[in-house]
């Protein structure tokens, strides 16, 4: 199981909200078209389709925290010395782009959720609920794999017993 926090989705999220980042990437001009976001969504769908065809299960979670809850968590991080490390002043600056981020999230979820690589939008104001919802989705995905421990044939069992005998005689 691999977990990516944002990953390649940054290119259709932060870069979309802050288009100056796109300009600073120094991409060839022919790649920056009016269709750049749709092209990037298509690239993401194709990449995840490739992963699916190679046996990788891709599930994605958007932890939907309300603006009010985010504010409360920021204040808690400021007030609690053990959580100060979690807070950055840039968090408040980015909060000013809330509506832009919500639009970007809506577009990326709408354009990159597929049957084989779905997005799960998780209400995340309640951390316990969010954790249960995520765990449930992961368990369901694992169950659908119908995984079983490998079995060994009689020849392998005999080989293991012979090795065990050698080890016991040391």
Regions found by a protein language model. Give the residues of each.
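Flexible, compositionally biased loop and terminal segments
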Residues: 1-170
């Amino acid at each position: 199981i691999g977990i990516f926090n944002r990953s390649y989705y940054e290119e259709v999220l932060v870069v979309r909200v802050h288009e100056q980042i796109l300009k600073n990437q120094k991409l060839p001009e022919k790649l920056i078209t009016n269709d750049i976001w749709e092209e990037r969504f298509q690239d993401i769908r194709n990449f995840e389709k490739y992963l699916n065809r190679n046996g990788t299960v891709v599930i994605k979670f958007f932890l939907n925290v309300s603006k009010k809850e985010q504010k409360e968590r920021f204040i808690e991080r400021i007030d609690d010395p053990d959580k100060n490390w979690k807070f950055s002043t840039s968090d408040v600056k980015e909060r000013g782009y809330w509506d832009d981020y919500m639009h970007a999230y809506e577009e990326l979820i709408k354009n990159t959720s597929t049957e084989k690589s779905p997005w799960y939008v998780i209400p995340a104001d309640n951390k316990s609920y969010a954790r249960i919802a995520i765990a449930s989705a992961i368990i369901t995905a694992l169950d659908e794999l119908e995984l079983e421990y490998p079995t060994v044939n009689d020849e392998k069992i005999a080989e293991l017993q012979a090795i065990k005998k050698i080890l016991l005689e040391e």
